[in-house]
Amino acid sequence: DVYKRQALPNCPQHLLTIFAAHKLGAVVAEHNPLYTARELEGPCKDHAAKVAVVWDKIAPLFQELSRTTPIEKVVSVNMIDAMPLVKRLALKLPIKSLKEKREQLHAEAPGTIPFSELQSPKMGGDGADIQNCPDTNQDSPAFILFTSGTTGKPKGAQLTHGNVMSNVVQGRSWISGI
């Protein structure tokens, strides 16, 4: 299996990368974006993902992890890019509180691949030519979620595509209108 690790807060880019990974047949290994290098090293070695899509504020941490884990490429996500235009413009105003908020949300991430470049024409198109992975079915792994490690080292729990679809069906039956 091909694995892609992800350490992102809730943001539109998070969903986009999940859909893209699954379209390619990759398994998404989710990580808490607030974890330290020590907390991430074991899980990163366990699933051996070569690509990490991460919040740009923590990109240096994953660049450091690339020295001791299989990470080969780090894609950095600027969360401000997906905000509505009014909010993006407001964050550019020279007001102290807005500058502090901007610094909380974004940091330069040299040496990484900016997420925005993945959406550019120079990357080879809009992805319409990518075919679904023929080997993916309801029993194929979709995600690896790691336990907290309260009784030892964190362990990776696999969710299959069937597990995820069952969760969607459950949600739709409990909440009308979705």
Predicted regions: what they are:
Residues K23-Q119:
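Structural core segment of the AMP-binding/adenylate-forming
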Residues V2-Y3:
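Short, small-residue-biased leader/transition segments that mark boundaries at the very start
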